[in-house]
């Protein structure tokens, strides 16, 4: 990459999965900071994980693998979900901004994942889970109220990361960088050091 050096990785959610793979394959970064990395998906109830694997595996080779995965929504989450029950942020202003971006620029809208995407993601997360952690300084942040990614996978990965540090943010939901100001500040301060 022809960018000023040194390089640092900051990655959120699925970006955390992609970023971890890139680091494992030699991305030349000095350190990494992960925000609620998707190293596993939180299924509720947990038995849904079995169904997700089975259905996405069966649908993957078919032409319908590009269809929205069963149980996923075609309307973007921040448009159909109200603030009180959302799983992304406790900051009403930040949550409103997320939805407003999509209303102003509809081309930014994403629906739920396709069955093919879900299957590829599940496979990649399992492959990464089986690998040792990189020899690289890292920070990882997750909230106690996380409902999108699998917290156990994060805890397991960071316990195996010799020069890694996990910060668990009390009450925080999935969007650490769009959470209440004191949580955002904690993330940006530690990441910037």
Model-predicted segments: where are they?
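Conserved alpha/beta-hydrolase "nucleophile elbow" surrounding the catalytic nucleophile
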Residues: 11-16, 143
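Catalytic active-site module of serine/aspartate enzymes centered on a nucleophile-bearing elbow/loop
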Residues: 165, 170-193
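Active-site nucleophile elbow and catalytic-triad environment of alpha/beta-hydrolase enzymes
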Residues: 109-131
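Core-facing hydrophobic residues within beta-strands of well-ordered domains
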Residues: 4, 29-30, 164
């Amino acid at each position: 990459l022809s960018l000023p050096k040194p390089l640092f990785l900051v990655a959120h959610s699925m970006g955390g999965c992609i970023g971890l793979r890139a680091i494992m394959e030699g991305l030349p970064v000095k350190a990494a900071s992960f925000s609620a990395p998707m190293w596993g998906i939180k299924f509720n109830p947990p038995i849904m994980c079995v169904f997700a694997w089975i259905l996405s595996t069966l649908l993957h080779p078919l032409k319908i693998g590009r269809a929205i995965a069963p149980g996923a929504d075609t309307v973007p989450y921040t448009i159909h979900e109200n603030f009180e029950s959302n799983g992304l942020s406790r900051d009403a202003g930040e949550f409103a901004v997320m939805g407003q971006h999509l209303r102003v620029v509809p081309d930014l809208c994403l629906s739920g994942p396709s069955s093919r995407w879900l299957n590829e993601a599940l496979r990649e997360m399992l492959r990464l889970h089986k690998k040792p952690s990189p020899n690289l300084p890292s920070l990882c942040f997750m909230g106690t109220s996380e409902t999108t990614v699998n917290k156990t996978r994060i805890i397991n990965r960071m316990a195996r990361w010799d020069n890694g540090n996990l910060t668990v943010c009390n009450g925080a939901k999935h969007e650490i960088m769009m959470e209440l100001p004191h949580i955002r500040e904690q993330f940006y301060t530690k990441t910037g050091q």
